[in-house]
Amino acid sequence: MDSMRKVYQESVSTGNMKRNIRELKNKMYAYSEMEQMVRECTCNDAQTPSEMLMKEIAKGTFTVEFSSIMTIVWKRLKDKTNEHHAFKCLVLLEFLLQHGNHEMVLSQVQNNLHHIQGVTSFSLKNANGIDVGHDVREKAHRFLKFFRDQHSVGPVDVAAVALGSGGGGGSGGG
């Protein structure tokens, strides 16, 4: 309890409230070091994720931490209250496909493609009524294009995978 009080007092004095709230949650929910890295990488600030941090997470995809990494990614991707969470998850997923455990990440993306397609219609208005979801929608479209280009999955096959019919990545003769 004293460590939580200390984090709170530091956040008030330094003005880093969001970061320190994240640290409090990390302690409260007993997140592993890898889970904390994913939370940091996909945090709700406007900065792009650190490449060094993404490299560490990519290494984690080759370990028993894989499922906890992906659990946080999918949870944050579905968050409709923070545009930065969804955007950074897409950045991280693209990075993990290139630098992480490709087969495992690919399988996760294929199984959760409907979540990524859902983000193509992401909409969030700020306090002034301005839609701040545009960048997320664009990134989702670019991610799907990247995914199709890298994995020879056509638009029809992507829809089939999203519907769960297992039609992704076939020979595609036509």
What name fits each language-model region?
Residues 1-174:
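Alpha-helical scaffold domains
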